[in-house]
């Protein structure tokens, strides 16, 4: 069965207009935590807004959040780092690649900071998959005393742009609490 995700992408006003007119997102570089691809926050427009505001140093007036549906077709693979099975798989894959990686990269390479991104890119080159989904701690957001849940955001990195349902790309217009 196909899997659908409702996602949000934060960007500048200028980039949002380009995305809406071309129905195309720009892929990130290779030095990102989930590797090369187009990044989204799953079900969380507020995190998309906060992230781009801090990361790109934009004012609230210059930030735009786009809503987009993603579809992973039944015959495509999705790597879900929210599950033990997929986390175990990627960690084992990294262990098997480690010697090759150490021979290839200097100890000062950014790989050692965003190891999963490089491993995910190596994996994609050998065995393409549609997207990867992972939970990360929300920066500067400690757990609330007495509450057991983790303060996390779900990030999605699309590796195959065909997952992006171009007809669903639109501005997120609901107010975002800041």
PLM feature segments, named:
Residues 8-14, 38-45, 70-74:
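Short, flexible loop/turn elements at secondary-structure junctions
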Residues 1, 29-32, 57-59, 144-148:
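A general structural signal for short secondary-structure junctions and capping/turn motifs
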Residues 64-178:
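Active-site and NAD+-binding cores of ADP-ribose-processing enzymes
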Residues 28-55:
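Extended catalytic/binding region for NAD+/ADP-ribose chemistry, centered on the ART fold
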Residues 5, 35-38, 63-67:
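Extracellular structured ligand-interaction cores
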Residues 1-33:
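ADP-ribose/NAD+-binding catalytic cleft of ART/PARP-like enzymes
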Residues 26-27, 55-67:
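Cytochrome P450 catalytic domain signature, combining two hallmark sequence patches
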Residues 48-50, 60, 77-80:
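Short, solvent-exposed secondary-structure capping/transition elements
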């Amino acid at each position: 069965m196909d899997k659908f995700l409702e996602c949000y992408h934060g960007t500048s006003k200028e980039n949002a207009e380009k995305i809406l007119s071309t129905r195309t997102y720009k892929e990130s570089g290779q030095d990102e935590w989930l590797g090369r691809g187009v990044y989204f926050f799953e079900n969380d427009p507020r995190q998309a807004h906060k992230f781009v505001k801090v990361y790109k140093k934009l004012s609230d007036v210059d930030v735009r959040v786009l809503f987009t549906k993603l579809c992973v077709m039944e015959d495509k693979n999705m790597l879900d780092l929210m599950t033990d099975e997929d986390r175990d798989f990627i960690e084992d894959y990294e262990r098997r690649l480690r010697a090759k990686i150490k021979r290839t990269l200097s100890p000062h390479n950014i790989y050692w900071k965003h190891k999963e991104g490089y491993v995910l890119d190596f994996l994609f080159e050998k065995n393409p998959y549609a997207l990867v989904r992972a939970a990360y701690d929300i920066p500067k957001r400690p757990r609330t005393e007495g509450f057991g849940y983790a303060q996390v955001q779900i990030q999605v990195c699309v590796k195959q742009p065909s997952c992006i349902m171009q007809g669903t790309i639109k501005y997120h217009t609901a107010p975002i609490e800041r």
